[in-house]
Amino acid sequence: MSYAIVGFGEIGQALAHAFARKNIDVTVASRQPPEALAPQARAIGLTVVTKSLQNAVEADTIILAVPFGEHREVAKTLPSWEGKTVIDATNAFPVPEELDGLPSSAVIAKAFTGAKFVKGFNHLPAAAVMGAKLMAV
């Protein structure tokens, strides 16, 4: 099983720390080039590796930790998300009109055609994730 975190802000970095604490390999990517993320990734742990977005989405499980409005750009990196699991850690604040009363995860799930889709981690502040002792990732 391979893992990637797309988005390397507070939540993305907190999740990377959680993987590193458990000595689990995880790829991280963002709109910045991998080289720009490398110092932060190395500081988190040896199991945290930076890659381009295109390479990161080759993982089996992708944690989406980007602002709500950026989910479509991530979804466009693959023509089909068949066989992938996408964990949506986004929050839609302020609530975009495009939701039309739907949960943000319902809107995001439509962009990731064929993926198994899970909503998670969005209810926790980054500090809670940083200190959490996750039983499983």
Task: Label the predicted regions.
Residues 43-47, 81, 103, 134-137:
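Short, hinge-like loop/turn segments at secondary-structure boundaries
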Residues 53-56, 77-79, 131:
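Short amphipathic alpha-helix with an adjacent loop that forms part of the alpha/beta core around
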Residues 1-39, 43:
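NAD(P)+-binding Rossmann beta1-loop-alpha1 motif at the extreme N-terminus of oxidoreductases
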